[in-house]
């Protein structure tokens, strides 16, 4: 049985560049849709996200940009927070891994793993720059590929032949920043022995939700576990307590940011202990939303880190992965010019158009593609032609004919059948949301709009109006508005602005939105919402929901 308390997290966006449509549809829109749905169900939802602010890519790019590390991550933290707001992502708290609570809990995780014999130190050879007086991580190194001889190969892989290797395997290694020659020196690092938790991890993944095509990947990954270094020779990061001049690898500290971010949230609401009711209570339902490239860290490595703790931290119940979203057949890449400026896009097209199309093409089980042609087709055919047309024509007809106050009339069997079919589709939508399928939810939304359009066409109230059969006209309008009420409900998680407009225009007697936060509608998806017997509608002049995309 699902808990009344729901914890939701989505992969922390890396503070190293702007978010693109692929990021949004892969982790943040699905998490937002699920959060909105669960709030409608009356659940106590906490959706936590935040910036991932450590790691080699940040230090390297900050240095190349001539910026301080904190200055650099501050810039992208603000950008990501603003992007979430513009996209209507209803995150309850957007934290960051430079928050005040993060260092202590990361170091505590490390000590607990040490005490259980799961972290051990090992001396290895790493590349050292005499000129810079420090060890250099792979991203700071270039050299000659040991496989193909390409003389500008990166420190972790060759962009010429695709080979991957350790930076120390490069021939003639040199500093990417200064060009200085590098030498090998011994250095001590801590390693997490994941292979010692293999049986625990296999048992764990059998009990959680994974998309079927990901389960084999995760199981195979666990079967081939090996020790992983948890420390790096860097100055920017969380210091390692017992190793001088070392910080934790970003993959180790970042997922702990979900917990420290919740601590940050608890402090912000004036209840520092509130984080515990989500992270130290196993009756909580925890859903995590990520892109497929983060699967191993969230399905295996972070749960392994939690297994090794003295506190019973909540482990994920549902790990919801997405494949990649391509742009016109290619990966999103600002440097290659295959990129859409999100601000410019939203200045031209409404937010709900974008949210709907991204949800409808969500890469849930395979890579999918965003193209402007499909965006245009879906907006014009589905949002304007089906959805908006149904709402507008019903309300325009009602207002024109003075039928703006509607109450439960005498209904015929065909009306009851229509209401029953509408309710069935709304319940189907609930099932799709509960199973993390935005694509199926979008299909059901359009199916309900088409059902309403078909009913209105078949009953042809304009003909009945000419005959003076106003009781029947009002009955048809009542049923159509009831369908629109359900349409607004099932649309809200994906198209919140549009759903609210519909509810404002039909003004159901049973619904008082005045006391609710419109961005966090709560406890509406109830049996009473579906009851039509005592319902009334007070209709307003229709507002165009969607315009054509040229």
From Swiss-Prot:
Binds 1 zinc ion per subunit. InterPro entries: Anticodon_Met, Met-tRNA_ligase_1, Met-tRNA_synth, Methionyl/Leucyl_tRNA_Synth, MetRS_core, MetRS_Zn, Rossmann-like_a/b/a_fold, tRNAsynth_Ia_anticodon-bd. A motif ('HIGH' region) lies at residues 13-23. One of its GO terms (cellular component) is cytosol. It catalyses: tRNA(Met) + L-methionine + ATP = L-methionyl-tRNA(Met) + AMP + diphosphate. Keywords: Aminoacyl-tRNA synthetase, ATP-binding, Cytoplasm, Ligase, Metal-binding, Nucleotide-binding, Protein biosynthesis, Zinc. Signal peptide: none annotated. Zn(2+) binds at residues 145, 148, 158, 161. GO terms for biological process: methionyl-tRNA aminoacylation. Transmembrane segments: none annotated. It is found in: Cytoplasm. Monomer. This is Methionine--tRNA ligase. It comes from Chlamydia trachomatis serovar L2 (strain ATCC VR-902B / DSM 19102 / 434/Bu). The lineage of its organism: Bacteria, Pseudomonadati, Chlamydiota, Chlamydiia, Chlamydiales.
